[in-house]
Amino acid sequence: MSTVVKDTHHEEHPSGIMRWITTTNHKDIGTLYLWFAMIMFFIGGLMALVIRSELFQPGLQFVDPQFFNSMTTMHALVMIFGVVMPAFTGLANWMIPIMIGGPDMALPRMNNYSFWIMPFAFSMLLSTLFMDGGAPAGGWTLYPPLSLQTGDAFPFLIFAIHFMGLSSIMGAINIVATILNMR
């Protein structure tokens, strides 16, 4: 009786969209971070245009005060957690392994996971614009009177901020671990 032996090849890498979803390559993840930062920069820029168009002249021109405050809150969160931190992390993913002579980041799976938390967090954050009562209007400090924050939007905002912070902390841990352990 003859037996056919089938070799399993683990060298095959996914292609297409699965390459980007499952990658642990630091340059691919850095590219994903930079593209995400650019997309969020344009979304935050549109929010800034709404804010600036309202401030063009005294009085009400385009939006009511609640929506203006919502835009201020959302613009701050998008620009800090959606542009600045992902752009720095994306550049770090590209530059740090090259600068220290390492083959990759120290924790590549956590690197991938910390990136993929962000699209879900920002989906939650931006979905508050379409909920009853509109997006939370906490201003730059996120310290509004809680009696004014009704509906589901504020809990979604807080949950999204937790996810954005988790993603940022995981990216920072990966950067520090790479610098300390791989140099």
Predicted stretch roles:
Residues 1-183:
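...captures the hydrophobic TM-helix bundle architecture rather than a specific catalytic motif
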